[in-house]
Amino acid sequence: MAGNSIGQHFRVTTFGESHGLALGCIVDGCPPGLELTEADLQVDLDRRKPGTSKYTTQRREADEVKILSGVFEGKTTGTSIGLLIENTDQRSKDYSEIKDKFRPGHADYTYHQKYGQRDYRGGGRSSARETAMRVAAGAVAKKYLKQEFGIEIRAYLSQMGDVSIDSVDWNEIENNAFFCPDASKVDAFDELIRKLKKEGDSIGAKITVVAQGVPVGLGEPVFARLDADVAHALMGINAVKGVEIGDGFEVVNQRGSEHRDPLTPEGFSSNHAGGILGGISSGQDIVAHIALKPTSSITVPGETITRSGEKTELITKGRHDPCVGIRAVPIAEAMLAIVVMDHLVRHRGQNFGVQTETPKI
């Protein structure tokens, strides 16, 4: 399996399975001198971890991260940062029924066909449990970006099923279990989740992630455009089936006179492009949206086949999220942070001394 790393200069490599002994990652390329403790990383891990809300899976993992290397006397050394989280609440017996059956809508069938075997306990490497290490690594990037450059990366739940938010109040996001910025929609989300639990079903969601304070100039055309790398990173999150930058697919219905973002001496007058032009950051907020599918781990019976190809039916047992989009909020933040951090380090290496006569707006 070769696809375990992301980034070029700021590079993250993860390892581990859902029901294995532990999850881990190596973070390469973090500059030396950054004050970093396990508590810095734990904040975002606690936002992502299971068992903290009645709306998500009741698997209870402490997700306590340990820094194994790369930090000395409270500061990064510039060497590889090793991070580890031990798994403590595995209930592998919940998955005994799917040992010889493929869960429809999951990676069971494709992993089995590709590798000739699979870890059926919670999906093994394909489980979203792996994203805990992405969040830990992303927390390193988030702290550096904010502390050194004033770049802040935040996300929120913007839609669940047919319920969409009408406004964004950043101060409201941490006041509810949905990471919802619109207090008037929390009750509707609550009602929807309760209904789904009774039905044994699930629902999809849309997450919006924003990077504020990103300087102009990040991105490496033509094959490492900033928007291309952002899309690649966000699309790599479990259950994501679509990524939009800026207005995304809404541009299909827009005229050029509407979509273009006029430049003025005071700055851009709109941000339909989502903060990226020609694959390079414009200095505006970088805005992306991801669509997450409804999980197939539900108690509604589904048609499938056995390892020998025989027709059968499956009801998924275990502890699962009725909407995986809720816990995807800190994951989206982490992936965007990793990409911005990587491009910042790349840009600094090649274009550090570049100056132009044009003022930055």
Swiss-Prot record:
It holds the Pfam family Chorismate_synt. Its cofactor is FMNH2. Reduced FMN (FMNH(2)). FMN binds at R125, S126, S127, N238, A239, G278, K293, P294, T295, S296, S297, R319. GO terms for molecular function: chorismate synthase activity; FMN binding. This is Chorismate synthase. It catalyses: 5-O-(1-carboxyvinyl)-3-phosphoshikimate = chorismate + phosphate. Belongs to the chorismate synthase family. GO terms for cellular component: cytosol. Gene3D superfamilies: Chorismate synthase AroC. InterPro entries: Chorismate_synth (IPR000453), Chorismate_synth_AroC_sf (IPR035904), Chorismate_synthase_CS (IPR020541). Pathway: Metabolic intermediate biosynthesis; chorismate biosynthesis; chorismate from D-erythrose 4-phosphate and phosphoenolpyruvate: step 7/7. GO terms for biological process: amino acid biosynthetic process; aromatic amino acid family biosynthetic process; chorismate biosynthetic process. It comes from Aliivibrio fischeri (strain MJ11). NADP(+) binds at R48. Keywords: Amino-acid biosynthesis, Aromatic amino acid biosynthesis, FAD, Flavoprotein, FMN, Lyase, NADP. This reaction introduces a second double bond into the aromatic ring system. NCBIfam families: aroC (TIGR00033), PRK05382.1 (NF003793). Its EC number is 4.2.3.5. Homotetramer. It comes from the Bacteria.
